[in-house]
Each structure stands twice: as structure tokens, then as C-alpha cells.
Amino acid sequence: MQVYMMNKPKGYLTARSDRNRPTVMELLPQELQALHPVGRLDMDTEGLLLLTDDGMLDRRLLRPEHHVEKLYFFRAFGRLEQEAFDRMARGVLLEGTEVLSRPARAWLSGYSTIGDCEALLPPKKHNHLMKNPHRPVTEGYLALCEGRKHQVKLMVKAVGGHVFALKRLSIGALRLDEALKPGEFRPLTAAELELISE
């Protein structure tokens, strides 16, 4: 079994191939093309992504009943108070569904402004957003055991925020190696493999 950790950069699709958009597989050399991503991160999301040739790993890490927590750090437009984080922790109705998110861990990290986050702003909206550089930004964490499409973004939206920067930091006890620059990858160590095999 091969398992690699990648610090997925923004701008890459988590897929084996796509006709029109770059994928994470394009960041890997030919000898690692037999690997596949474990789960997916949105194109504009960065952070911990696992790649493996073990089909059972997906099931073990991704199915909600296995309770493997994924930790995300987000920045969102707007000022979300503690009550919003309490609501996300209890579960919120996800837009476009009749589904209540499962209970999660959610906590506030702090506040900044659009001006403080200029380098992280979506390029197409940069100039428009910088017209109001003092607009508040909320920084927070969400730890989820389920992984619905756009879940973090939808949960934050349900409490009045709009995520513009999102990074996955960990899967279970396995944390992203912060020494990896965006787009870099490495094989898991024996100790790290144990963390995802338990």
C-alpha cells in the first residue's frame, strides 16, 4: 500500500482527470499516476490531501459512521459571533438540501479585515473587495466527521458568513506537514500510516 500526503494548492481539481481544468494528478510524476485522491477538496480549497493505491482507505477515512474527523481552517466575510459557531456545532440546515449537518466541533479563532487578507482574496473579485478594506473577516475552525459537497462553505453560509479561504489541516490524528509547500507531496512515514490505520 502506498499513501502520499500532498499540500493541495488552490486552482487544482481533486480528480484523476478533467478536460478543461488542471487536476492534482498533474502535480505527480509518472510513477505515481496509479494513485488516486482520498476524497476531494474543492478547486479553491487547499491543504491536506491523501493519495493512495488502497481502495479501502477511502472507506475507512471518509464514511461518517467511522467518525474520522477532518479539521478545516476558514476565513469568511462578515463578523460571526460565538452564537454562530455554537449553531454550527449543533448542526445547521444546508442550503439546497433538507439535510441538517451532523454535530461538529466549531470554534472562533479571531477577526481580521479584508485588507489584512488581501493576498487570499479571489482574483476576480479582488479590486471590488478592496474598495472596503476594513470590512470584517471571521477566522475559525470546523471539525467534521462527514464530508458533503461544499459542506464547510454551506455551514458557514447558514449562519451568515461567506467563506473565501479554506484549508484542511488534518484527517483524524494525521496533520498536514507544514513544511510542504503548496503542490508538494511526500510518502507517509510508518508512524503516520499507523495514525490512519487505527
Q: Where in this protein do the model-derived segments appear?
A:
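Basic, flexible Lys/Arg- and Gly-enriched helix-loop patches that mediate nucleic-acid binding at interfaces
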Residues: 1-198
